Regions:
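Hydrophobic beta-strand anchors of alpha/beta hydrolase catalytic cores
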Residues: 72-73, 103, 150
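Structural microenvironment flanking redox-active thiols in thiol-disulfide oxidoreductases
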Residues: 84-123, 134-139
Length: 181
């Protein structure tokens, strides 16, 4: 008798768990779909140095208020080992093409500003860092699902290339040259 009761409870918990996962999953998919299929999304990236960048997403095209340079947006976290390993290479590329290109880091975590500043100092990051809710909105529009993810845009706001994981500096260099032409 105890076995039957246990079995019934187990089955109820199993089906309840599965159904709530499906509900969460469908809600999440709906949120993503509405965000990526929206005709007009505007937001502002806020940088630790006080600078702001206005971003507009309209009919699956991006425009940035700063059109002087090509941009490599790097989505990452403080706990991601490949993200940390990529930093010296990104510093090199940011310095090499500083007149026509910039690396922009977007943290996808809600750390306190002081924690992020400590991370930047410890890891010797030499490129702008954006923090805040807009980073999450931008990552949803671009369907970022893992870190590190990097997305390269030319100065006109056209998406050139997307990368997932640790990418060799030489490969990034070649694509950056294409983006700044």
């Amino acid at each position: 008798m105890k076995f039957k009761i246990f079995l019934v409870i187990f089955i109820m918990i199993f089906f309840t768990s599965c159904s709530s996962d499906k509900e969460n999953s469908s809600t999440e998919n709906t949120d993503n779909a509405s965000l990526t299929q929206s005709e007009n999304i505007d937001f502002t990236l806020k940088f630790l140095d006080g600078r702001k960048m206005y971003v507009k997403y309209h009919e699956q095209e991006f425009s940035f208020d700063d059109t002087a340079k090509a941009k490599l947006f790097v989505f990452f976290t403080t706990w991601c080992a490949p993200c940390k390993a990529q930093i010296p290479h990104l510093n090199n590329l940011n310095k090499k093409y500083q007149d026509r290109f910039e690396v922009i880091a977007l943290f996808l975590e809600e750390n306190k500003e002081q924690e992020i500043l400590t991370f930047i100092e410890d890891e010797k990051m030499k490129f702008p860092v954006a923090i805040g809710e807009s980073n999450f909105a931008f990552s949803k529009i671009l369907s970022v699902s893992a870190v590190p993810t990097m997305v390269l845009f030319n100065a006109k706001g056209e998406k050139i290339k997307e990368y997932l994981g640790l990418i060799p500096e030489e490969m990034l260099d070649i694509d950056i040259q294409k983006a700044i032409m």
